[in-house]
């Protein structure tokens, strides 16, 4: 006869389920009345009785929690119990499995310092003998020694079996001052000339943070053995994050080992693999698009950029038995590679991640290259118009799919003689998500680039051509204005009044003399004019 408990949450899951204790072991299955269809169809979790190691009872986030330490499957957390369930669970475990349920109380002081204990399946942070919190090793993705006395622990948020409700913590840092003696249990080697029984005056020491970092790596199985890697590449140059790393590729993960930092990547983090020749015709780039991005403290790297010499070749053999290769990797990988390095690593990543490799498409610049030189903000780089996206390298790396592009605007950079040799390419995104401007592109590339974008059914607007069309239409309208028929208004302006007769000059003089006694005759007017500007000036008298 089994014992069942409803509304129990496993490993902080979003949805509750039914927990069962039977003679054969433990089981949990998500409730049929809650969760998505995929969650409901998920197979129940079963734990054989032979896997049980220790069991603890404590207060949790949702009522009371039952923590089960297993022999080979890590830690199982079940919460949602009531306080009255303790006696039932305690009796069941003792009767069925001969295991005592230990009652644990957590420290609620709220202090941020204490002691660390690296137990069998989890790291325990305790204060005065009471646990403050526990971190299962299965939840730790990576750890780095970020400073002399500081260790950063990164958590795995790509585990499909772990789907907690709400926000997740992605990193925690521990400050460990002090130092420890290395191999203090073993006698130090005697120096030359040192007498028997005389101890060495100096002993090798290391920081406490470094010792904790190395022990945590071993306990959490973060640093896999290099011999277990399917294939390894030594001293590969990365432009992002900058440095040289040894790459160990495993069945489900990738390990990057540098002089200062180490990174662990899950295969399902790699969303895209792009292989592009660099414009200098010397190097070749392989870009890995990551989601979620690689983290180094507060810095995130959504793209990893590997650089190889174009003609560099490598010869590697997969670290797999013939049987394992035939069963798992025959259709994905080659048993042995002897080719250019960037081709080998691209093919291996493609086979293990299931992502296709994106390569340059139809576009060719005036100089038969697949990229054009340009600038993005204050950074210079190269824009690669691929068959379905824009790709800008190298810093920052930008990937803009054509599906996200609303239109492309080609505009001149300025009116001076220098800037008229270049133009700007503005990529406007859909749904009012802003735009990205690539500037200082050579004018020689404009027509080729414009034709390529139009062939991809993108809306291309050329501001320079539009301005010329507007100017021509404006000039055409001005010439048409001369022939416009103004109607009766025009005739009134040009008509002659037949009743009006212009009198001669003599009549004018007579009228002026009759009504104005000071009116001057024509001859007098001429004399007055001569007195003015028409009269020659006298030469100055010289003594």
Swiss-Prot record:
Acidic residues: compositionally biased ranges: 478-497, 505-531
Classification via Gene3D superfamilies: 2.30.29.150, Pleckstrin-homology domain (PH domain)/Phosphotyrosine-binding domain (PTB) (2.30.29.30), Structure-specific recognition protein (SSRP1) (2.30.29.220)
Subcellular localization: Nucleus; Chromosome
Pfam family, one: PH1_SSRP1-like
Gene Ontology CC annotation, any one: FACT complex
Biological process terms in GO annotation: DNA repair; DNA replication-dependent chromatin assembly; DNA-templated DNA replication; nucleosome organization; pericentric heterochromatin formation; positive regulation of RNA polymerase II transcription preinitiation complex assembly; silent mating-type cassette heterochromatin formation; subtelomeric heterochromatin formation
Record has Transcription as a keyword: yes
CDD domains (alphabetical): PH1_SSRP1-like, PH2_SSRP1-like, PH_TFIIH
InterPro entries referenced in this protein's UniProt entry, alphabetically: PH-like_dom_sf (IPR011993), RTT106/SPT16-like_middle_dom (IPR013719), RTT106/SSRP1_HistChap/FACT (IPR050454), SSRP1-like_PH1 (IPR048993), SSRP1/POB3 (IPR000969), SSRP1/POB3_N (IPR035417), SSRP1_DD (IPR024954), SSRP1_sf (IPR038167)
Keyword Nucleus: yes
Keywords: Chromosome, DNA damage, DNA repair, DNA replication, Nucleus, Transcription, Transcription regulation
Amino acid composition bias (Basic and acidic residues), ranges on this chain: 532-543
Protein family (similarity comment): Belongs to the SSRP1 family.
Biological role stated in the UniProt entry: Component of the FACT complex, a general chromatin factor that acts to reorganize nucleosomes. The FACT complex is involved in multiple processes that require DNA as a template such as mRNA elongation, DNA replication and DNA repair. During transcription elongation the FACT complex acts as a histone chaperone that both destabilizes and restores nucleosomal structure.
Name of the protein in question: FACT complex subunit POB3
């Amino acid at each position: 006869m089994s014992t069942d408990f409803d509304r129990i949450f496993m490993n902080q899951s979003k949805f509750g389920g039914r927990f069962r204790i039977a003679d054969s072991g433990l089981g949990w299955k998500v409730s049929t009345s809650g969760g998505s269809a995929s969650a409901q169809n998920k197979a129940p979790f079963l734990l054989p009785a032979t896997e049980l190691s220790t069991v603890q009872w404590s207060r949790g986030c949702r009522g009371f929690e039952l923590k089960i330490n297993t022999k080979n499957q890590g830690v199982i957390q079940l919460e949602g119990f009531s306080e009255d369930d303790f006696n039932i669970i305690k009796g069941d475990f003792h009767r069925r499995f001969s295991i005592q349920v230990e009652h644990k109380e957590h420290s609620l002081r709220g202090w941020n310092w204490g002691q660390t204990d690296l137990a069998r399946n989890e790291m325990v942070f305790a204060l005065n003998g009471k646990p403050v919190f526990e971190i299962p090793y299965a939840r730790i993705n990576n750890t780095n020694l970020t400073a002399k006395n500081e260790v950063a622990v990164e958590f795995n948020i790509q585990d499909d079996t772990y789907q907690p409700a709400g926000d997740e913590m992605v990193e925690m840092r521990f400050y460990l001052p002090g130092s420890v003696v290395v191999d203090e249990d073993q006698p130090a080697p005697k120096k030359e000339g040192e007498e028997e029984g005389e101890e060495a005056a100096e002993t090798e020491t290391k920081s406490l943070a470094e010792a904790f970092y190395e022990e945590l790596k071993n306990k959490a199985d973060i640093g896999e053995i290099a011999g277990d890697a399917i294939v390894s590449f030594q001293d590969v140059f990365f432009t992002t994050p900058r440095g040289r790393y040894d790459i160990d590729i495993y069945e489900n993960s990738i390990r990057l080992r540098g002089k200062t930092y180490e990174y662990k990547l899950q295969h399902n983090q790699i969303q895209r693999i792009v292989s592009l020749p660099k414009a200098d015709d010397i190097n070749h780039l392989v870009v890995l698009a990551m989601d979620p991005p690689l983290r180094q403290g507060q810095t995130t790297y959504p793209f990893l950029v590997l650089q190889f010499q174009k003609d560099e070749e490598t010869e590697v053999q997969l670290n797999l038995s013939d049987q394992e290769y035939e069963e798992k990797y025959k259709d994905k990988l080659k048993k042995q590679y002897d080719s250019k390095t960037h081709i080998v690593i691209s093919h291996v990543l493609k086979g293990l991640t299931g992502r296709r490799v994106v390569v340059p498409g139809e576009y060719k610049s005036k100089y038969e290259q697949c990229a054009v030189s340009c600038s993005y903000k204050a950074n210079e780089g190269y824009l690669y118009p691929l068959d379905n996206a824009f790709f800008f390298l190298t810093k920052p790396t930008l990937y803009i799919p054509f599906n996200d592009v609303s239109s492309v605007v080609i505009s001149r950079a300025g009116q001076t003689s220098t800037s008229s040799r270049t133009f700007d390419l503005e990529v406007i995104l859909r749904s009012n998500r802003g735009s990205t401007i690539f500037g200082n592109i050579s004018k020689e590339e404009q027509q080729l680039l414009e034709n390529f974008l139009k062939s991809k059914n993108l809306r291309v607007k050329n501001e320079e051509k539009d301005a010329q069309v507007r100017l021509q239409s404006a000039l055409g309208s001005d010439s048409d204005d001369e022939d416009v028929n103004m109607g009766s208004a025009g005739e009134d302006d040009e008509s002659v009044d037949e009743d009006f007769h212009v009198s001669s000059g003599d009549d004018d003089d007579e009228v002026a003399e009759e009504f104005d006694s000071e009116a001057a005759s024509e001859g007098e007017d001429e004399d007055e004019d001569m007195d003015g500007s028409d009269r020659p000036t006298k030469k100055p008298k010289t003594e």
